[in-house]
Regions:
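Conserved short strand/loop->alpha-helix "switch" segment adjacent to the catalytic nucleotide/phosphoryl-transfer site
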Residues: 30-54, 108-110
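Conserved beta-strand-loop-beta-strand hairpin that lines the nucleotide-binding pocket
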Residues: 1-15, 61-154
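STAS-typified acidic loop motif
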Residues: 15-27
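Hydrophobic residues in the alpha-helical elements that line and stabilize the ATP-binding pocket
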Residues: 56, 60
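Structural signature of the histidine kinase catalytic ATP-binding subdomain
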Residues: 20, 41-44, 79
Length: 154
């Protein structure tokens, strides 16, 4: 499952290949939480990273499997130069990521549809690359003191 703990140049990194199933979400959360603690990421920042990355993985589980029981997702995270990055790649049908849904707050009566909004609110950079062969979400967060922000706020 976990393929690496250090990437090229000795940078802390993780690379996972997991099934697109709901039981993969707590696995990612536990492993990522362990790494954030090991890297001494401040608790408030770690909480923001865990919430945003959990939303990204949940989106891959919900939308990426697309009825395929053997569908998998590739998850990576790394720490380099005071920046944390996290990505999840699924093989789903993709979606139109150009809409305003990514920055729009969901109506309070909705049970779903807040994931991309939450990711944008908590992370410094969110990139969504979606097409017919799947979707990749990249999240980035500056960890240097004063270099980033906790988020834009919900």
């Amino acid at each position: 499952m976990e393929e690496a703990t250090h990437g090229r140049l000795g940078r802390p990194t993780a690379h996972l290949l997991l099934p697109c199933r709901s039981d993969s979400v707590p696995v990612v959360r536990a492993l990522l939480s362990r790494d954030l603690e090991r890297w001494a990421v401040p608790e408030e920042v770690a909480d923001a990273i865990l919430l945003a990355s959990g939303e990204a993985v949940t989106n891959a589980v919900v939308h990426g499997a697309w009825g395929q029981q053997d569908s998998a997702m590739v998850i990576r995270w790394a720490m380099a130069g005071g920046r944390f990055s996290f990505s999840v790649q699924d093989r789903g049908p993709g979606f139109d990521s150009s809409g305003t849904a990514m920055s729009r707050r969901a109506h309070p009566s909705q049970n779903r549809g807040r994931g991309l909004y939450i990711m944008h609110a908590l992370m410094d950079r969110v990139v969504v690359d979606s097409g017919l062969n799947g979707t990749r979400i990249l999240l980035e967060k500056a960890l240097d003191a004063g270099a980033g922000r906790l988020g834009r706020g919900l």
